[in-house]
Amino acid sequence: MAELGKEVVDLFNQPGRIGTLATADKHGQPNAAYFGSLRPMADGSITVGLTNNRTLRNLQENALAVFFIVKEGPVTFQTPGYRLYLKVRGIHREGPVLAEIKGFISQHAGPEAASAIAAGVVFDVTEVRPLVAMG
């Protein structure tokens, strides 16, 4: 598992940051969606709560994803940001992981948003790359 440095964690925790999670189904059909709820955990993993949506369906078929995270928009070649390459460790439809994620979402987005969450996903970070890498 790749290590998340302090700069990456700080960017996750910055209000107004922008994040896009890219997934693909078992046939390679891509999907990208804006997410504000991904967050780093103490063990270096990343968690997110998902509704029954295309992202969740894709992750059930293909465990690989990329999270694109930037400080702010508009994005330029100088905008601070990273690409985090992820692999699903687990998809939790019940139990303490889902409960913790729903609690976090309830606290930050309200109980209605939390009640829509169908699964909590835990990712291992396999690689961290800068937003812009020539080569």
Task: List each model region and its residues.
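Binding-site signature for planar aromatic cofactors or substrates
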Residues: 1-135
